[in-house]
């Protein structure tokens, strides 16, 4: 008998060892020839992988939500059940960790608050933080269209896609559509709005209302012949279709895609790069006029404004629908803003005045984008980019000051990072935009604390057209540039690889959260999870019925005890039994009946 037991034990151990040996092996490596001729290892992926469409990412989002809630329940924490009447999501476009750190110092030095390093940004004090993985379905390093779709709709997608999942088609404008948090909010009777310093048709704001194959199709003239009749340009979608034509607030740049060019627009400072180009309409339509006509029968007439003075004169206690378009293209960088252009803070305060009215009971959802942080980095304009972050911080402070912390969930994050570095061994209090090693007198080459992996700054700093033997002679000494030149917003910091447009960075981005539901932000998660945080905390969209907390909140009941069974989640696992995210019966039911 003992021999049989020992034999069974040995056989069982052998099977277990063999199984473990198989399942713990890393994916097989294959070697491929890259376009540049270099051979590098890549993982063999995609052969048995399920399609990463909206249903796939819906599953991922709900699993992360369940995992996070279980973690809270294990430590008897119930703050995750608190519900938000209002939601504000701040997107610092391109605001990676290096930008946040450098921007914090820039703020302190700009305001002359000590050395700079000890300064704080408003969102530094938010109680909950996490890290979001930003990759697109088809790219390790993402773009703003795919990331914004993930944030607002809960589905990761292809690079360049807006409001559509990975099944999108150039010849089918309905295929792969996903709803955004703005659509979810409007179904619950909430007010909605979008504020940005970019064109209102640019990638991030467009992802709140548009569904289109390519982010560049902002005007009718940009839609290729093969897609005409299937896809409608982004600007038209804003005024023709919900949720865009039901927004209470639309503030930003982009008059040209909307069909109302200002021929006398002033440009005091000339910025360069692809971001400064803009499309024009070919159908001669005046879309703001059509927007006004759409709201002509409103109880209170809509307001259309084009300058700072008119914006600040809007009666926010009466106006229900406001559109403000302030430039043909993007609103000018804040460091060189033209007369008559509002600040992001002013636009945010005006938006909140309209959205958060005392006589309204359903609340609101608002996007505020600091969009030109990204565009400054693309041109290696470090000073312009960091000043945009400072303005972004002021807008966040305005939101904190003008909302109820017990009713408003505020999320601050980036859609992606940038290839910008904060390097060297600069002395404490050294100018963040200055040199890192000027105190080292024997160093043969001074270099700046902020530099870029790639971008147009390469050509500005290159000593000559050939690569010399001594790499230290490859770059022009910084003394070649005058102090005035280096202080200009158009000064480009050095980039080590030549590109007309600096690239994004692929590292995780930080998420800062404040208010009811903010405790759902913890750890590292896929970026699309943010949509599920807003859905669950705001009682809207696909996670509204994830458990009974929204019904309890609606009925004015006390939070459900942690050990109370949830009838909507039949078959749910015992609380705290496992931190491994699994799909419960209720979650599966939501997947079947509430697809994005």
From Swiss-Prot:
Q: How does it assemble?
A: Homodimer.
Binding-site residues for Zn(2+) 1, renumbered to this chain:
374, 378, 504
Where does this polypeptide localize?
Answer: Cell membrane
Named from the GO MF annotations, one term is: metal ion binding
Instruction: Provide the disulphide bond pattern.
Output: 539-550
Q: Name one Pfam family in it.
A: Alk_phosphatase
Entry's Gene Ontology BP terms: epithelial fluid transport; nervous system development; sexual reproduction
Instruction: Give tissue specificity per the record.
Output: Ellipsoid body ring neurons in the adult brain and in the lower Malpighian tubule and ureter.
- Function, as annotated: Important role in neural and renal epithelial function.
| Residues of this chain annotated as glycosylated in UniProt | 262, 297, 401, 464, 470
Propeptide positions in the record are: 571-596
Which residue ranges does UniProt annotate as crossing the membrane?
Answer: 571-591
Query: Which reaction equations make up its catalytic activity?
Result: a phosphate monoester + H2O = an alcohol + phosphate
User: How does this chain sit within the bilayer?
Assistant: Lipid-anchor; GPI-anchor
Binding-site residues for Zn(2+) 2, renumbered to this chain: 93, 415-416
Q: Which UniProt keywords apply?
A: Cell membrane, Disulfide bond, Glycoprotein, GPI-anchor, Hydrolase, Lipoprotein, Magnesium, Membrane, Metal-binding, Phosphoprotein, Signal, Transmembrane, Transmembrane helix, Zinc
For activity, the cofactor(s) needed are: Mg(2+); Zn(2+)
Q: Where is this region: Disordered?
A: 548-570
The note on cofactor binding and number reads: Binds 1 Mg(2+) ion.
Q: Where is the composition biased (Basic and acidic residues)?
A: 548-566
Any idea of its EC number?
3.1.3.1
InterPro entries named among the record's database cross-references: Alkaline_phosphatase, Alkaline_phosphatase_AS, Alkaline_phosphatase_core_sf
Protein's UniProt name: Alkaline phosphatase 4
For this record, an example GO cellular component is:
plasma membrane
Regarding protein family, the annotation reads: Belongs to the alkaline phosphatase family.
């Amino acid at each position: 008998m003992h021999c049989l037991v020992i034999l069974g034990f040995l056989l069982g151990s052998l099977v277990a060892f063999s199984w473990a040996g198989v399942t713990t092996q890393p994916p097989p490596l294959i070697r491929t020839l890259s376009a540049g001729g270099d051979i590098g290892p890549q993982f063999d992926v995609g052969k048995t992988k399920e399609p990463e469409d909206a249903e796939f990412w819906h599953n991922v989002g709900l699993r992360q939500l369940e995992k996070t809630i279980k973690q809270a329940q294990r430590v008897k924490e119930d703050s995750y059940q608190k519900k938000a009447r209002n939601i504000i999501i701040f997107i610092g476009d391109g605001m990676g960790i290096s930008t946040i750190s450098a921007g914090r110092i820039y703020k302190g030095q700009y305001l002359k608050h000590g050395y700079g390093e000890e300064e704080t940004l408003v969102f530094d004090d938010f109680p909950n933080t996490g890290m979001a993985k930003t990759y697109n379905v088809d790219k390790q390093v993402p773009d703003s269209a795919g990331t914004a779709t993930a944030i607002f709709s809960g589905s990761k997608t292809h690079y360049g896609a807006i409001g559509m999942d990975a099944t999108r088609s150039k010849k089918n404008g309905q295929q792969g559509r996903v709803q955004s948090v703005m659509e979810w909010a409007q179904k619950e009777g909430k007010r909605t709005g979008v504020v940005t310093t970019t064109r209102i048709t640019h990638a991030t704001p467009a992802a709140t209302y548009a569904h289109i194959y390519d982010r560049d199709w902002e005007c009718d003239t940009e839609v290729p012949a093969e897609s005409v009749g299937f896809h409608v340009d982004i600007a038209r979608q804003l005024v023709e279709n919900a949720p865009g034509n039901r927004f209470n607030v639309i503030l930003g740049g982009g008059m040209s895609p909307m069909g109302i060019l200002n021929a006398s627009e002033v440009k005091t400072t000339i910025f360069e790069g692809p971001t400064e180009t803009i499309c024009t309409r070919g159908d001669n339509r005046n879309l703001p006029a059509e927007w006004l006509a759409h709201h002509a029968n409103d109880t209170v007439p809509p307001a259309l404004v084009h300058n700072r003075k008119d914006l600040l004169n809007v009666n926010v206690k009466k106006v229900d629908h406001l559109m403000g378009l302030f430039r043909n293209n993007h609103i000018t960088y804040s460091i060189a803003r033209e007369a008559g252009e509002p600040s992001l803070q002013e636009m945010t305060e005006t938006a909140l005045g309209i959205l958060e009215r005392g006589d309204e009971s359903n609340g609101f959802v608002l996007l505020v984008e600091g969009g030109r942080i990204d565009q400054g980095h693309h041109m290696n304009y470090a000073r312009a980019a960091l000043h945009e972050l400072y303005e972004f911080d002021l807008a966040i402070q305005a939101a904190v000051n003008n909302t109820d912390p017990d009713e408003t969930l505020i999320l601050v994050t980036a859609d992606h990072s940038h290839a910008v570095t904060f390097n060297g061994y600069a002395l404490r209090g050294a100018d963040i935009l200055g040199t890192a090693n000027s105190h080292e007198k024997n160093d043969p080459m001074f270099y700046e604390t902020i530099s870029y992996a790639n971008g147009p700054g390469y050509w500005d700093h290159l000593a000559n057209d050939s690569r010399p033997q001594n790499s230290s002679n490859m770059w022009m000494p910084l003394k070649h540039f005058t102090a005035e030149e280096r202080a200009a917003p158009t000064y480009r910091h050095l980039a080590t690889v030549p590109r007309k447009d600096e690239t994004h960075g692929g590292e995780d981005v930080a998420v800062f959260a404040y208010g009811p539901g903010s405790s759902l932000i913890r750890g590292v998660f896929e970026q699309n999870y943010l949509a599920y945080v807003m859905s669950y905390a705001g009682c809207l969209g696909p996670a509204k019925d994830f458990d009974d907390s929204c019904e309890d909140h609606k009925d004015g009941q006390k939070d459900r005890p942690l050990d109370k069974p949830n009838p909507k989640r039949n078959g749910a696992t015992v609380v705290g039994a496992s931190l491994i995210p699994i799909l419960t019966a209720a979650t599966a039911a939501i997947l079947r009946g509430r697809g994005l």
